[in-house]
Amino acid sequence: MSTTTKKSLESKLQQLKCHFTWNLMAGDESLDEFEDKVFNKDEFQKRECKATMCNILAFVKHRRGQNASALKELEKAEQFIQQQHPDHVEIRNIVTWGNYAWVYYHMGQLEKAQAYLDKVRQVCEKFSSPYRIESPELDCEEGWARLKCTRNQNERVKVCFEKALEKDPKNPEFTSGWAISNYRLDFWPAQQNAVDSLKQAIRMSPNSPYVKVLLALKLEMNQENQGKELVEEALREAPGETDVLRSAARFYYKTHDKDRAIQLLSQALELLPNNAYVYYYIGCFYRSKVLQIDSRRETSQNENREQLLKQAIYYLKKAEETKEMIKDSCSYLAHLYVLAEQYKEADYYFQKGFKKELTPGLKQLLHLRYGNFQFFQMKCEDKAIHQYLEGVKIRQKTKPKEKMTNKLRFIAERRRSQNGFDSKALHILAFLQELNKESQQAAKVSERGQDSERPVFSPSLHEGGNEQ
């Protein structure tokens, strides 16, 4: 095939609606991070999306250079589409065929790539378009793919399902996708009223256990009993569905039934024995029980506390051993070892935590915890000061930064009261004074920028907008 023909083929491939053209990976996201997010971290595993998952896995396999495995996943996707959508096989297969074409193109098997392009064209030409058509099924498939693969495209996900619903407003699958996207939009980027859409999805498809748990999570603040009924109903309907078990565990944790939450996650762990995030959350729930005992100073619970502490450490260590990508597992482990008075192990996990690529907020928290460890347990004030200073140098306003600033000021004032010429105390105070000046200056610059860019709202928009 000539170079000109190859370029023509690539031009046609770019017109396809499939995982190779949807830009599902964030720009700074590694393939390991993408795969981990989709197949481990994200709890959503809708039964009706088996073909979607095979297509995503095929995309990942291709990116890893495992094209033979990618083709096998695409074969599975075709089989699931045949089973789950026998009346819409051609339309539903357009995405899978597009993925086939891309994989064969990258393998250099251009004739096979063209053959799958021809299959797509034959379907699309029925709708007067060569390689791309507007179809609710395709909008739905794109919506599911983006729902699984992205975290910052919730508005776009919602638009996909809304477009599908415009053409088929009574479709239960489209309504479920729309409701789930509304639920996610309730957290980021803006507040939505997800309750009504979740209720609508359940009315249209009563056997939607995952959606029922999402509704329960929305109701738990004010209607806990109704939420609990929905969760237990979902668990009866789908006792072996990991997304139901994991989301139900979140519900019980939020309603302060940590034992039930741990029980549900333990069931999920039997089905997902290599999922670091399930280990991680079980460990976090045990950790929460330990901290609750400590905060109440329940000395009668000392024996129970010791067992809970061991469990928390065990599960968080398993999470760290299974997947080192979880950012704050080392910080939690170090803190737990401090509580267990195992200081060598605590220091090991503090050091390991600093080697991870942490967000500014998590790094500040780690500096605070390590500083406290040096100050209170190791009785090494100089090392504690070093950690607090490193933490407050990070340019992000957080609660840990405020705590470290206060600790530094307290240490400096105490040292200066004992020796007015203490060089370290004077250095700390000078540093904090300079830091305060920088913060005030940055705040003024930010305020001036906001004044100059402040939009002028029309009365109708202002009056009808969401008040938050």
UniProtKB/Swiss-Prot annotation:
The modification N-acetylserine is found at S2. One of its GO terms (biological process) is innate immune response. TPR repeats lie at residues 51-89, 90-135, 136-171, 172-208, 242-275, 276-328, 329-359, 360-398, 399-441. InterPro entries: TPR-like_helical_dom_sf, TPR_rpt. Residues 445-454 have a biased composition (Basic and acidic residues). Domain-swapped homodimer. Component of an interferon-dependent multiprotein complex, at least composed of IFIT1, IFIT2 and IFIT3. Interacts with IFIT1 and IFIT3. Interacts with STING1/MITA and disrupts its interaction with MAVS or TBK1. Interacts with EIF3E and EIF3C. IFN-induced antiviral protein which inhibits expression of viral messenger RNAs lacking 2'-O-methylation of the 5' cap. The ribose 2'-O-methylation would provide a molecular signature to distinguish between self and non-self mRNAs by the host during viral infection. Viruses evolved several ways to evade this restriction system such as encoding their own 2'-O-methylase for their mRNAs or by stealing host cap containing the 2'-O-methylation (cap snatching mechanism). Binds AU-rich viral RNAs, with or without 5' triphosphorylation, RNA-binding is required for antiviral activity. The C-terminal part folds into a super-helical structure and has an extensively positively-charged nucleotide-binding channel on its inner surface. Belongs to the IFIT family. This is Interferon-induced protein with tetratricopeptide repeats 2. It comes from Cricetulus griseus (Chinese hamster).
